[in-house]
């Protein structure tokens, strides 16, 4: 009886709206371009909400990531298990008890957690959700390239002040699914003699980055790689098989994925999903490949959060993950960004190599108080991921040196300070670059990205059984670099060494060894009189357009094989 009275009292406090606070006051709630409101949602309709519970020992987790990722540390390569991570960050008993009582009082019944117990996903009716989260008002929206339907609130939500120490944020209210940034460029005109290639294929990738027909997985090691797909993006096995028939004849490969985690729909294949799978499996050839499919098919789901929760619920995971997802930093609440950054830190502690596309808007641009500034993207700006930029061939039809792909995302975070591992490289760039934009356009003390790059221009992809040319974007360069790292992991595992894990501390210590330095070109930015559409420019060593450069496989293997 005492517990029931306590719960009723807590729920009464919630309903009154007294002593409440907003966990995400800075979350942007303007409707993204391409989305349309369809009006209020039915009060009896059900939706799922994800509650991010406050974790413990995050600072200690950060220290452990540094220890297991730094080659000079005696702990290098001694990664944590999922169970180790869970023991470290699991919310306190008080947090678990308080949140569970609160949800029970609100009528939430269908809830499930993850092994780390720091996420809780519950199904509620719209009526219950609006009572639970005062201020929220759920509407239907449709948008995106596949006419996706979502339920979101255009208004901020409140939580009882008593929950402030226990809940970071509630997912499924504000953030819209990201749209694909892939571009299909016009076919360049061939002039003069016939070129050596008519678009980027696996054979072009392998020739440029010095991969021989023998540089494939053994098929016997405990090695695997993965890509993640969102927003109703699916691949088809038949497309993968046709792609390998067309372009995989000169190297051993696998023609099907080993495992799909999540929901793999039966709709039309998406170009981005097809690209991710086909080039991860041709660069990292003959290596077991997983696909994480988090399409966000239910209207209340946030696909990226779903993927993070899948990582927190699997003990045995692929060693390399490539992700072509990103949002503008300024479009996300600080609570959301900081918590997602902790999730990426958890993955790094477990020895996972996470590669994120740097984006396809150059330095980006937005207006702050009437003045233009560059616009960094997240998670590309996280200090716990390896971010991949994009390049083009200097001569479009010749396998030659690379230059900047002008769309390649890059810049400096407005949220995360510069990590110590890149202090020397970034300081050198800022002090020596002859073409720096005005200092008012970027945060010179922020985490700088990308870290590396690969070709991002003019790919061939098979989608819905149709070969499609001239697909471009860092969504292409990211799986290519990921596949090459998987080949290096293959050698490390077969020689009794741990996989590479979080790569950045080692990458910056080696000052670009094993990479082709890209020194020509600039990327795009604000179209104004001051910068005239030009962002940062590449140069010798690290730069915020192509990072340390593109992979030279034999040299990179030699550099990363030991210890």
UniProtKB/Swiss-Prot annotation:
EC number: 3.4.14.9
Cofactor: Ca(2+)
Active-site residue list: 272, 276, 475
SMART domains given in the database record: Pro-kuma_activ
Residues at which Ca(2+) binds: 517-518, 539, 541, 543
Cysteine disulfide links: 111-122, 365-526, 522-537
Propeptide: 20-195
GO-annotated biological processes: bone resorption; central nervous system development; epithelial cell differentiation; lysosomal protein catabolic process; lysosome organization; nervous system development; neuromuscular process controlling balance; peptide catabolic process
Secretion signal, residue range per the UniProt entry: 1-19
CDD domains: Peptidases_S53, Pro-peptidase_S53
Record's subunit section: Monomer. Interacts with CLN5. Interacts with CLN3.
Name of the protein in its database record: Tripeptidyl-peptidase 1
Classification lineage: Eukaryota, Metazoa, Chordata, Craniata, Vertebrata
């Amino acid at each position: 009886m005492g517990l029931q009275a306590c719960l009723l009292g807590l729920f009464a406090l919630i309903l009154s709206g007294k002593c409440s606070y907003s966990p995400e006051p800075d979350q942007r709630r303007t409707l993204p371009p391409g989305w349309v409101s369809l009006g209020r949602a039915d009060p009896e309709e059900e939706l799922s909400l994800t509650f991010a519970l406050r974790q413990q020992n995050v600072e200690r987790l950060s220290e452990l990531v540094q220890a297991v990722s730094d080659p000079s540390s005696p702990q290098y390569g001694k990664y944590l298990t999922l169970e180790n991570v869970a023991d470290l960050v699991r919310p306190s008993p008080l947090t678990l008890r308080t949140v569970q009582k609160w949800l029970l009082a609100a009528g939430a019944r269908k809830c499930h957690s993850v092994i780390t117990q720091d996420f809780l996903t519950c199904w509620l009716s719209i009526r219950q959700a609006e009572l639970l989260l005062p201020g929220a008002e759920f509407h239907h929206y449709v948008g995106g390239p596949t006419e996706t339907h979502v339920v979101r609130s255009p208004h901020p939500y409140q939580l009882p002040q008593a929950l402030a120490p226990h809940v970071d944020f509630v997912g499924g209210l504000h953030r819209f699914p990201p749209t694909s940034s892939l571009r299909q460029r016009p076919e360049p005109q061939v002039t003069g003699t016939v070129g050596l290639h008519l678009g980027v294929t696996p054979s072009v990738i392998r020739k440029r980055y010095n991969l021989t027909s023998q540089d494939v997985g053994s098929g016997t090691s405990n090695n695997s790689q993965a890509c993640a797909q969102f927003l109703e993006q699916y691949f088809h096995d038949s497309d993968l098989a046709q792609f390998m028939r067309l372009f995989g004849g000169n190297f051993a490969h696998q023609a099907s994925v080993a495992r799909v985690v999540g929901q793999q729909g039966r709709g039309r294949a998406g170009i981005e999903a097809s690209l991710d799978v086909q080039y991860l499996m041709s660069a990292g050839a003959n290596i077991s490949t997983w696909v994480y499919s988090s399409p966000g098919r239910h209207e209340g789901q946030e696909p990226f959060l779903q993927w993070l929760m899948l990582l927190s619920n699997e003990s045995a995971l692929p060693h390399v993950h490539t992700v072509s997802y990103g949002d503008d930093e300024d479009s996300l609440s600080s609570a959301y960004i900081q918590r997602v950054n902790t999730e990426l830190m958890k993955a790094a502690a477990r020895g996972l190599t996470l590669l994120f596309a740097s984006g396809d808007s150059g330095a980006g641009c937005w207006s702050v108080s009437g003045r233009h500034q560059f616009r960094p993207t997240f998670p590309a700006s996280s200090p716990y991921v390896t971010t991949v930029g994009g390049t083009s061939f200097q001569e479009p039809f010749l396998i030659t040196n690379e230059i900047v792909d002008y769309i390649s995302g890059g810049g400096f975070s407005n949220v995360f300070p510069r990590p110590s591992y890149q202090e020397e490289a970034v300081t050198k760039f800022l002090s020596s670059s002859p073409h720096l934009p005005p200092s008012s356009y970027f945060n010179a003390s922020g985490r700088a990205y990308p870290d590396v790059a690969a070709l991002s221009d003019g790919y061939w992809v098979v989608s819905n059984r149709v070969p499609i040319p001239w697909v471009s974007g860092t969504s292409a360069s990211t799986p290519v670099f990921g596949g090459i790292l998987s080949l290096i992991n293959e050698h490390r595992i077969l020689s009794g060494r741990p996989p590479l894990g979080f790569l950045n501390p080692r990458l910056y210590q080696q000052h670009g060894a094993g990479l082709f330095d890209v020194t020509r070109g600039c990327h795009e930015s604000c179209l104004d009189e001051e910068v005239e559409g030009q962002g940062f420019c590449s140069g010798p060593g690290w730069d915020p357009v192509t990072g340390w450069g593109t992979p030279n496989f034999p040299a990179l293997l030699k550099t990363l094989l030991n210890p």
